Amino acid sequence: MTHLVDLRKKPYNLDDKAIAWVEETIANMTLDEKIGQLFVNMGSSRSEEYLTQVMEDYKFAAVRYAPGLAADIWEQNYILQTKSKIPILIAANTESGGNGAVTDGTKIGDEVKIAATNDPRYAYELGRIAGIEASAVGCNASFAPIMDLSRNWRNPIIANRTWGAEVEQVITLSKEYMRGIMENGIIPFAKHFPGDGIDERDHHLSFAPNPMSKSEWMETFGRIYVEMIEAGLPGIMAGHIHLPNVEKEMHPERDLDDMLPASLNKTLLDELLRGELGYNGAIVTDASHMVGMTASLPRRELLPTAIESGCDLFLFFNDPDEDVKWMKEGYENGLLSDERLHDALRRTLGLKAKLGLHTYEGRREEMMLPKEEALALIGTDEAKEISNQVADKAITLVKNKQKNLLPVTPERYKRILLVEVEGYKGGFGALINQGKKRASDALKELLEARGHEVSIWENTEERIKKLPEEERPAAIQNVYASKRPISEITDHYDLIINLVDVNSGGTTQRIIWPAAKGTPDQPFYVHEVPTVVVSVQHPFALADMPQVGTYINAYDSLPNTISSLVEKLSGDSEFTGVSSVDPYCGLIDTKIWHSTEMGR
């Protein structure tokens, strides 16, 4: 059976007038309008001409746009809401703050950083600030919070984007985030059902199943979703994640070949989520360009299958003409039932009614705050102060086994060498970060202001790339043939700080060491020069440098984070962060420090 929505019940709680609007709106739709209302558009322009044209052509229900300046986003959303026939859901990815809605918004911190403050108040503040800044420019939905469990340190997608590894903490912080953002008129779509963070692959690029048994899943992810549903969670994003062992227990007659990811799987969405867990809200697919979805079925089939399986909104067109045609064909040939089509429309329109969008007919411009008033809510001193507090409280001293290494003062360590440690450099991340101030430059400035002499090491590969092409082969050969005195390091530096800046962007989230031998590129010198490692992105860098005795997770390289880091290194501030994940990565050697006093 298909579980149909009850708009009078949680999370909608609609009155008769609102339900009448939902039903009358559906009754007055053409088939093309009904099909259009299944889609979430990703716009390629903010111009009025483009926005009005695509709304007329494709009649979509919702938008998820790329962030821009608040002034531009306000204009975009004003056009969308005043020119659309039916009010639009306008979503952003406010996972870490208002910066997910507008580029001049406030980043409070990724979820793992918020969790490291060890204070649920900051999860609420994250939601609240994100809600204030997003709603100011006309957003009314967000694809957050992330409720995955960080149980595999090799996972490249949610390493710093999830609250942590423990069920209770994820529940507590997700509820607080939801409370903060819903207070400000934003519908949260929690993700990624049925649960990421167990497999080490990226469902943007590959299948990435969750291998849990049903009892394991019910005690972990199932419990998280049950608690959030009970708390009134209005939206869920279905990930392109298989749940094969759970599905096999529910349907022993099925083979693995019969099983699809959750975004295309009626058993997982209708029987499990809506049936056993009692979810009555709306479901959006994760992005439909991801290989976890596109490699599962021909696109002509996966479009109607996603809706028939229980999704109410389909995230992003590929080619809009093609996608709309195929969704309509799927309805006409029975792949998408009339019952499921109309249930999806009720759930989506129900969210719009829950937000009160139906009450603005004839005065749509009043949905938006006046522009000047809206822009005054972006990047306020209050929001920046919350971000500063999180930066101060979150930084975590994970490993501190070198006796008396801290504090870092000019009297103890006059000459400091900063060594940048990086990962995959390709992809869009490299293009986006071009020209941005590096964490090492910011750290250098702050340390020099305190009286240190600071150098930044140019890694061996980068140096060789600058040589004339004909000289490079000999230089590379020399890397492996040459040896150099340790005194080249010990005579010149009193302290070395390895700054690990490795973020997602490839199939793996690991340090990629440059070709080098005897240079500071890799921290072989931990017993030659006092050495500190600081990760300014993902919290699992210790796996690739277990030999170090002092390791710190800063979680990001925001200016206030680097400033707080320097205060803590110097002893002016205490380390108070508490890791919500296993920074030792379940490995034995990451906890070891070979003291120089051994064997004496």
Regions found by a protein language model. Give the residues of each.
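Active-site mouth loops of central-metabolism enzymes
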Residues: 37-47, 111-125, 206-220, 289-297
